[in-house]
Amino acid sequence: KGNLFNELKLRLPGRHNLQNVTAAIRIGVELGITEFDIRKALESFQGIVRRFEWIFEGKNQVYIDDYAHHPEELKAAIEAARSCYPDRRILGIFQPHLYTRTRDFAQDFAKALDLLDEVILVELYPAREEAIPGISSHTILDLMDLKQKAYVLKKDLIEQLKLKKLDI
């Protein structure tokens, strides 16, 4: 409908969020909601907790929390970080969630994590599941091509991070 939503300013990065916004606009228009009200809602929406949530943004460091627990979500979060900080070094800290998910998607997790500059994996969080022999965070780590990768116990993570020059 013409120039509807020209120059809309969004607070959420990433192609996946743009697709979500496009769908929300389409539904709003179909429901007869005015452009003003749709724009106001979208421009004020800050996202949800633990989905590309900026925890800290300083001159030299940025901390973003994202509870991506599926390879496609993880890839989308990494691509969003790259779009926000294209020339910055991005370190990802990933804790696999569930033995079955790790087993079923290990290759896809490894491929997504390879998009980072450096990765630290911590121990798998089993939630409600019993351990599956041979499945751990190392299952993903061993499939990764990335050279800058490590496994660190969660209890040692802060000390390990203090030794690094962090960026994103």
Segments (PLM) and residue ranges:
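Short, intrinsically disordered, charge-balanced linker/junction segments flanking boundaries
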Residues: 1-4, 161-168
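Nucleotide phosphate-binding/pyrophosphate-handling subdomain across enzymes
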Residues: 2-118, 142
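C-terminal helical cap/extension that packs against the catalytic core
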Residues: 110-165
